[in-house]
Curated annotation (Swiss-Prot):
It is an enzyme of class 4 (lyase). Keywords: Lyase. This is L(+)-tartrate dehydratase subunit beta. GO terms for cellular component: catalytic complex. It comes from Escherichia coli (strain K12). Heterotetramer of two alpha and two beta subunits. It catalyses: (2R,3R)-tartrate = oxaloacetate + H2O.
Amino acid sequence: MKKILTTPIKAEDLQDIRVGDVIYLTGTLVTCRDVCHRRLIELKRPIPYDLNGKAIFHAGPIVRKNGDKWEMVSVGPTTSMRMESFEREFIEQTGVKLVVGKGGMGPLTEEGCQKFKALHVIFPAGCAVLAATQVEEIEEVHWTELGMPESLWVCRVKEFGPLIVSIDTHGNNLIAENKKLFAERRDPIVEEICEHVHYIK
């Protein structure tokens, strides 16, 4: 059975979810990347949309006008780690509960997710057109002066995913744990190879 989170998301909705789980999102998803984070945290400019209990997507979409409506053409994730220095404060100030992106995030986001009860989840790279099909409607757009990729596109989505949980509300970090595990497995293998093939060193 699919685990589907529906906005507005509450802290108790997240407490039983763990890293490695696969979930889906129904409700409000707002594209929000580098400049948006900088405006809020560095410039102290309030975001013109209430993100409390909502989800953001580290993404730079391609959209087109269809009559008087905007239509999502492609929306793939961008590298979440670029927002690492801002994400803890961003979660605290906005009350956002789901951060969607590509790749993992670091200890600051981990701390923010644990303290303020949020998740970081990974949307598979290379699936931007699939993601666009899961956007039912673009309901609003803000900060259009930033250009298409950096604008805040407020989307209504249905069963958006799959989303792999990389940081949960208990301080677990899937990517960090995997890096440690891979290093532990790699080192003895490299040492053994080096015994037989000396020029590798």
